[in-house]
Amino acid sequence: MAGPRNVRTLHGNGGRNNDVMGPKEFWLNIPPITRTLFTLAIVMTIVGRLNLINPWYFIYVWNLTFKKVQIWRLLTSCVMLSSRAMPALMELYSIYDRSSQLERGHFGPGLSNRRGPMVTVDYAYYLCFCILAITTATTIIYGSYYPVVLTSGFISCITYTWSIDNANVQIMFYGLIPVWGKYFPLIQLFISFVFNEGDFVISLIGFTTGYLYTCLDTHTLGPIWGMISRKADPTYGISPNGKFSTPWWFTSLYARITGAHNETATFNNNFANVPSSQRETRTFSGRGQRLGTAPATLSQTSGTDSGRASGSQLRSGPSNLNQFQGRGQRVGQTNSPSDSQ
């Protein structure tokens, strides 16, 4: 007889699936940088739709960005969603999915020794490099007064980097056509060329930026050149990577922004605030002895001297412990007759 089915009803939580996350759990489960991009895209769409802020202030224009010091346009123009529902949902999903996988995998904690807030510094540096490269190329092509939305270029850039890690992973293109991950950026470029001719150049700039980062990160001419020149190494242009590392000045700046530089100071302050009776200290707890008396046993001196003993002293074995065990005497006293016998 078949077992009971998991019947879900509209009322109560008797058939609730514990694996389904609520909105709060879903939001908290997103990596921090991706969460910021995801939230910013949604907030910009809402405030723009409600006319609380003119969407013009989100668009990238070189003259306004740098001459008028409206630096936020560098970021807002990369996550500005389409005014149409379906393209906007696809763009939002692409930002969430590609960015979260890069932050967890390609630039994640498993591939570096960073911990805490600093675990995301490499991904932050990657995004800053790509955004600056995309905006620079766009300014060269379109000029300093041309307004442009860079969302398609930003998505193409992170999609290309994502495709390197998922080259042999089969995915469903728009949920219909199975394709390999390594061909996904090229298919996106083709779709942009056929249906969105206005975004094709921006998408191509993003694709080129992602490829440029790969070349710098591997010190090669990239996987496309490896395929054209028929390199014997199939990983040419892909690995080993990590050669375009985050510079020290960016790491220091990021630590100040995120507050990571205060972690050591906070630990020291917390230790200083602990009462002296609760601190774990290392003090001598053995018996004292006068100069010239027999040394204490090993168990009495191990609290201090063993911590400072060198490796050669520890390896010398018990020979160092077989010392004089007779009666002690003060310095300057003569030996008693019983001792001389």
From Swiss-Prot:
List keywords of the entry alphabetically: Endoplasmic reticulum, Membrane, Stress response, Transmembrane, Transmembrane helix
Record's compositionally biased regions (Polar residues): 276-286, 296-341
* Induction context: By endoplasmic reticulum stress.
The answer to keyword rRNA-binding applying to this record is no
Localization, per the record, is:
Endoplasmic reticulum membrane
Identify the InterPro entries for this entry.
DER1, Rhomboid-like_sf
Q: Which family does it belong to?
A: Belongs to the derlin family.
The record's principal subcellular location, in a coarse class, is endoplasmic reticulum
* Disordered: annotated segments: 276-341
Q: What is this protein called?
A: DER1-like family member protein 1
- Membrane topology designation: Multi-pass membrane protein
The cysteines joined by S-S bonds are none
Lumenal compartment ranges equal 63-122, 192
This protein's gene is called DFM1
Source organism, top-level taxon: Eukaryota
- In the record, what terms sit under GO molecular function? protein folding chaperone; signal recognition particle binding
> What cellular component GO annotations does this protein have?
endoplasmic reticulum; endoplasmic reticulum membrane
Q: Where are the transmembrane segments?
A: 42-62, 123-143, 171-191, 193-213
